[in-house]
């Protein structure tokens, strides 16, 4: 379980409206994520506006990988392009970025979602009250780190058509 592997369950498991259950967990370094047990959620899209990938940004990959291995059976390895990745069954679950310097990573360890977007997304984002914080070269492509008007952080790539 999460707690016996060094993590913390912050919420749940709680019932979800579709009959499943949801919980909020933090890994040993504090990166938070949500787990869901139940039927596959409807409305998951690919392409523009959809999820392009996930990434874990931590100060010490060796400190958290035993947790994810115990909880989900994930392994640390390399994807087909030789990039450090979190793997399961030969497939890439997420990319793993070890960023020890808090000046580059920020003060927190975190999971990030990378979305596919159209080339004018930066302009639309700032016009809607969001902010582009930085550019980053990620395995998913040239990405922008951004926040929505409420401060929630995410990444997007503007190379989708």
Give the positions of each predicted feature.
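Hydrophobic pocket-lining residues within nucleotide cofactor-binding pockets
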Residues: 16, 61, 117
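Short hydrophobic/aromatic beta-strand micro-patches
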Residues: 57, 114-118
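Eukaryotic phosphotyrosine signaling hubs
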Residues: 110-111
């Amino acid at each position: 379980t999460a707690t016996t592997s060094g993590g913390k369950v912050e919420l749940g498991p709680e019932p979800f409206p579709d009959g499943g259950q949801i919980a909020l967990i933090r890994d040993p370094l504090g990166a938070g994520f949500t787990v869901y047990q139940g039927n596959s959620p409807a409305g998951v899209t690919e392409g523009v506006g959809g999820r392009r990938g996930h990434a874990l940004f931590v100060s010490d990959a060796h400190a958290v990988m035993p947790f994810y291995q115990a909880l989900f059976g994930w392994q640390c390895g390399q994807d087909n392009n030789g990039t450090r990745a979190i793997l399961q069954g030969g497939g890439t679950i997420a990319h793993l970025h070890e960023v020890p310097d808090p000046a580059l990573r920020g003060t927190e360890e975190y999971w990030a979602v990378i979305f596919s977007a159209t080339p004018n997304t930066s302009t639309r984002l700032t016009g809607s009250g969001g902010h582009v914080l930085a550019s980053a070269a990620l395995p998913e492509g040239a990405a922008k780190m951004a926040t929505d008007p409420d401060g929630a952080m995410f990444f997007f790539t503007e190379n989708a058509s």
